[in-house]
Amino acid sequence: MGFSEARAYRAFGGRSTWLTVFLALANSLAVSAKCAADYFVDSLPGQPDSPQVQMHAGHIEINHKTSANLFFWHVANQHIADKPRTVIWLNGGPGCSSEDGALMEIGPYRVTNDHLLNHTDGSWDEFANLLFVDQPVGTGFSYVSTGAYVSELGEMASQFVTFLEKWFELFPHYEKNDLYFAGESYAGQYIPYIARAILDRNKKGESLTRWKLKGILIGNGWISPRHQYLSYLPYAYQEGIIQGGTDSSSRVEAKLSKCLNKLNVEDSTGTVQISACEEVLQAIIDETHKGNRCINMYDIRLTDEYSACGMNWPPDLENMAPYLRFKNVTKALHINSDKQTGWSECSGAVSGHFRALKSKPSVELLPGLLEEGLPILLFSGQKDMICNHIGNEDLIKDMKWSGGTGFELSPGVWAPRQDWIFEGESAGFYQQARNLTYVLFYNASHMVPFNYPPRSREMLDRFIGVDIADIGGNPADSRIDGEKGPATSVRAHPNSTAAAEREKEKVKSAMWKAYYKSGEVALIVVAIAAVIWGVFIWRSRQKHQDRGYEFRGIYPMLGSSSSGSLPRYSNKRGRRGHDVEAVNIYEAELDERPSRVVSARSSREQEPYVVGDEDGSDVDDDTSDERKRLVDKP
């Protein structure tokens, strides 16, 4: 021990407890100082000037020990209807990023081939806040220590509840929103488990704020593996992919026979994945192999190079993947550059660990959710094969809940299929009974909103109860069995002056509530730390004066230019001196903010953030391996 260190130790011996307590509080203060403003996305490269879109993005730690962080991307609603609503969107995989949903499906923007962002007609942020989350840990921009990946659905749901608790601490005014979950494919497993976890959490007592879960939507869901496996060959026959009585059909039927044996032996209604049954779909795809082409399993109207067979689809992926790797984009989204997470559409490491061997399939949770009063909407794109509509329709037909089977209205009487006409075109059909709604989209793929943003938005607004008759705007012409439902707007933004004034009042109220809630917590921590610090300094000075020492701070040997945590804390809030988490930004701030338009030239001049080769190839090697597993759905 050197002279200065020894002197400091003698000077502050007996103060280690005080020092430990203070440092712990200082650390807590630094953590609590992380606020919504730190996540604010000022602009994105290539973002259009209008309409203004308020966004927040970044990582939230859900487990310090394993460095488990989930990435979120929040998009605020353009307008508030009768009440605020938040839709949480999850893509599937397992291990596929929800940026697919954000930039190719329901989000406000699509990426062009010159790295600009175009606004999407029919995006879901018109009357609902959107929250995209990369989960489980390790998916997309999320990260976790090696070996700490999630393997079961219950564990995934528990981690997601932890994420929501921390997210609502940052954005407290959203905690009182009506809450909906939406997603597709393997999210058909995620979402019912998360819904179950939320309903169970709400029963734990009055100390917790009850989250107002109002419904879930699942598109082309991997919900009942048994029904889906058994639907592959009937779907192939129905769509003319395989002809009965041919050598092709015999080869596929042989694979199906092995699958049936496995299903019967294991009685595996309670199994999420059966490798022997995965071979049925692969056999069908192999029968379409001609030259170097094969059928696209996500949209059977298309072909792809063999053996991708749909893995290169949708075409927007070619633009989106490099965009999400540009340094200026990752910086705008507050990606933790120290972790070098990069971005890939699907993670082989996540899917390799997430086998759900001990988890029952989510179809077994649906009856209980429905009977507890949770509305559920299942929708299917007609031209998807991997999670095709026959499998989902069969699971509904066999499911029992609330005293009936399937869409029974009474014993032997089923709810009719109601024709859906959207803006003069036959769009599909609706069928509903006892809290469950099913929608089939004609001529749509595995990713319905990719094909039909306005139609999918109309479905959402109808499900969550938006009626623009109260706020102004041009309603869409959408009719079910010839009858118009609530007025919904899928293109034109409401322009009612009265609506704008009402919305401004709601924004102001929500903003101040958010300030009060987050401010109270920070004030308490600051007050406690200040009191302890003051007592510590006073007692130390008294002791030192008695001993003839001069007080110079906690670590006098460091001199006056300390780089400790407290000086850094003064800059934690970044460029803004206040929290910008409220539903919308002050009009004055919008006026002062520079234009968000970034020219194609300036966007291209930015150095791309490339994971892997200099050519910016799409994904790492484990991604292609993962997507070859047919159970892995985007």
UniProtKB/Swiss-Prot annotation:
Q: What are the Basic and acidic residues biased-composition ranges?
A: 625-634
User: Which of UniProt's keywords are assigned here?
Assistant: Apoptosis, Carboxypeptidase, Glycoprotein, Golgi apparatus, Hydrolase, Membrane, Protease, Signal, Transmembrane, Transmembrane helix
Please provide one cellular component term from the Gene Ontology annotations of this protein: trans-Golgi network
**GO biological process terms on file:** apoptotic process; proteolysis
**Where's it mainly located?**
Golgi
**Spans traversing the lipid bilayer:** 518-538
Listed EC numbers: 3.4.16.6
Q: Where is the composition biased (Acidic residues)?
A: 612-624
What is this enzyme's class at the first EC digit?
hydrolase
Q: Which InterPro entries match?
A: AB_hydrolase_fold, Peptidase_S10
Q: Which residues form the active site?
A: 185, 384, 446
Q: Which residues lie on this side of the membrane: Lumenal?
A: 34-517
Residue ranges annotated as Cytoplasmic topological domain: 539-634
Domain of life from the UniProt record: Eukaryota
Q: Which residues form the signal peptide?
A: 1-33
* Compartment annotation: Golgi apparatus, trans-Golgi network membrane
Recorded catalytic activity of this chain's protein = Preferential release of a C-terminal arginine or lysine residue
What's a single GO MF annotation on this record?
Answer: serine-type carboxypeptidase activity
Q: Which residues bear sugar attachments?
A: 118, 328, 435, 443, 495
Q: Which SUPFAM superfamilies match?
A: alpha/beta-Hydrolases
Region annotation Disordered: where it falls in the sequence? 475-502, 592-634
State the family named in the UniProt similarity comment for this chain. Answer: Belongs to the peptidase S10 family.
Q: What does this protein do?
A: Protease with a carboxypeptidase B-like function involved in the C-terminal processing of the lysine and arginine residues from protein precursors. Promotes cell fusion and is involved in the programmed cell death.
Q: Write the protein's name.
A: Pheromone-processing carboxypeptidase KEX1
* Native organism taxonomy: Eukaryota, Fungi, Dikarya, Ascomycota, Pezizomycotina
The primary gene name is KEX1
